[in-house]
Amino acid sequence: MKSRLRLPILLLALACPALFAADAAAPRWNILFVFADDWGRYAGVYAGIDGKPSLNDAITTPNVDRLAREGVAFRRAFVNAPSCTPCRSSMLSGRYFFNTGRGAILRGAIWDSAIPTFPLQLRDAGYHIGKSYKVWSPGTPADAPFGGQTHAYEKSGRAPNNFSEEVTARVAGGMALAAARDEVLAQVRGNFDAFLADRKESRPWHYFLGVTTTHRKWVKGSGQALWGIDPDKLKGRMPAFLPDVPEVREDVADYLGECQAVDAYIGVLRARLEAAGELERTLIIVSGDHGMPGVPSGKCNLYDHGTAVSLVARVPGAKGGRVVDDFVCLPDLAPTFLEIGGVKPPAGLYGRSLLGILRSDRSGQIDPTRSWVITGRERHVENAREGYVGYPMRALRTADFVYIRNFRPERMPMGDAKTAFDPKVLAGNTLTEETRVGFADMDASPTKEWLVRHRDDPRWKRHYDIAFGPRPAEELYDLRKDPDQVNNVASDPAYAKIRGEMGADLMRRLTEAGDPRVTGDGLTFEKPPFAGPVIEESANEGSSKKASRKAKN
């Protein structure tokens, strides 16, 4: 009898080796991951952590805050690259963004299927996996690191990607605001329920909700109309790089409203977990792919406003109410999820597992070696500059300083002005609606338009220069004195020693990591396929394109 059982088991092991490779000591929790486009470090929990006036004073996120009370909030969580596709390439693989082939750029990205990613590795280790909306995009094939659309659950609807547009349209059609919101939230619930219903037996699962809600565009005035966020409450709380004027405050309030929509989605998913009896065996973790879009120092910048993100987790069986000061970079999530699933991480990872920190009962600095992160970017919008080239940057962030190396300071950081100053452009609201008119590495927005219109006003010229002006080869910011990173002290003799040390440390780490920007001839990213015109991807971007009406940048 035993010999007859051994043969089929042996054949199954040979056919599906990954199913038998899982570490028996691994927790094998379910993993619920909410990952929002352009969601920076904005949640109510951070207002208390920051300890000073900030934009977080104006946002209400009861569901994220509850996760933090029951789990852990990371004070120093950063993306590896503040641009959608390269950030996701890095996060999904656990590698530096510059080690992901054509995944290192935005427009023109093509996924290298030879690079392992945590969702597919979990699938091969016996997890039931599923996703709704955006995982990896723009790029070809869309969502390739998650298996494309094979594991998509979106039949209940895609309205959650465009919360303010969808709810505003329903209200304009005569629906009550509460009913309109509930109708959109029902689609989040329906897609997740369909995913859970598909699970075979009691297999562990991983679900990825990738909403584009917080990506522009959104409805002007929606922060107050839909969420009651008063733009005037932001007065005196704006960071130094943002003009503290009504137009910009309203724009920021609208963004915070979309962040609150993401919080509502998190609440829906948590409620479904409780109803299904799955809450206490599920890791819930929430974050975003970079900072605020369409504003100075945000998306596509290596200042904290561009690279710092929310990261909050509820961990089964762990102590809640913790705030961790360790530096965390989103590539750390891949080895974390793999360790939870009992999967051996592949070689070549930059990220390090956070499982020990998640299970710890301590706050503050837990791992003393987690004292820095590296961030960077290459090309974002392909035609932002003449020659279809990017604006290469790398940065080293520590507790007290941010050091930035701009490898091509002769280029414009947000792209060429193009027709941004054309009277015909300024006659309307083109800079609010069309990103590629000028400075294309900053999303179209009311803030962008306001800055361009006030570029010659002495009161606001510094804000304009921070947003669009040229930058030197080196930048250094003393966070103890300048938390908003607006006073570059790289040329100050008093900082010569720290500038030299951080510059050398950054270059050493990049060289050790095999960054093509600093190894070989250093020109890899200056040549096709990383530079030059992009042939428009066709059907390969299909689902992600359908999933959202947001711009693909």
Where are these regions (language model features)?
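Formylglycine-dependent sulfatase
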Residues: 11-15, 21-475, 483-504, 518, ...
